[in-house]
C-alpha cells in the first residue's frame, strides 16, 4: 500500500491521537499544512485532512459501506500490551475489553481502539 488519506471532523483531536499512535509505531511526521498532516514509515504514509463543514454529517460509522478499520503491525505482544496501557491512560476507548487481547480470535493477539472519529484501529502482534 502506498498511502491512506482520512478526512476527519476535528483535525487537532485527530492529530493528537494519530501523531502519538503512529510515533509509537515508528512513523515520522512527513507533511504538514493548514488543513492536514501526514506520517510516514518506510514507503507507506497516512494522511489526515480536516473535512469541510458541508461534509461533517452524517458522522462516520464503521458499519456503513466503506472502511471498517485500519490494522497495523506491532513488533511484539509486549508492544500490544504497552499500547493497551497507554491508550487507557490517555483516555482512548479500547474495544472488546471482555475478549482482549484475543478479540480477533484465538491466536490473534491484538488491541482494538477508536480514534476521535470512532474509526476502529487495530494493532496486531506477530503470529508465533
UniProtKB/Swiss-Prot annotation:
InterPro entries: Fosfomycin_Res_Enzymes, Glyas_Bleomycin-R_OHBP_Dase, VOC
Pfam families reported for this sequence: Glyoxalase_4
Disulphide-bonded residues: none
PROSITE patterns hit by this protein: VOC (PS51819)
Domain VOC: start-end pairs: 1-126
SUPFAM superfamilies reported for this sequence: Glyoxalase/Bleomycin resistance protein/Dihydroxybiphenyl dioxygenase
Protein name: Uncharacterized protein YqjT
Species of provenance: Bacillus subtilis (strain 168)
Amino acid at each position: 500500500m502506498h498511502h491512506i488519506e482520512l478526512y476527519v471532523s476535528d483535525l487537532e483531536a485527530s492529530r493528537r491521537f494519530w501523531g502519538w499512535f503512529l510515533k509509537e509505531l515508528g512513523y515520522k511526521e512527513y507533511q504538514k499544512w493548514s488543513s492536514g498532516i501526514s506520517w510516514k514509515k518506510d514507503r507507506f504514509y497516512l494522511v489526515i485532512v480536516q473535512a469541510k463543514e458541508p461534509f461533517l454529517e452524517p458522522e462516520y460509522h464503521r458499519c456503513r459501506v466503506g472502511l471498517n478499520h485500519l490494522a497495523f503491525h506491532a513488533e511484539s505482544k509486549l508492544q500490544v500490551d504497552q499500547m493497551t496501557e497507554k491508550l487507557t491512560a490517555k483516555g482512548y476507548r479500547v474495544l472488546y475489553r471482555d475478549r482482549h487481547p484475543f478479540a480477533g480470535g484465538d491466536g490473534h493477539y491484538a488491541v482494538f481502539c477508536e480514534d476521535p472519529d470512532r474509526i476502529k484501529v487495530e494493532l496486531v502482534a506477530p503470529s508465533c
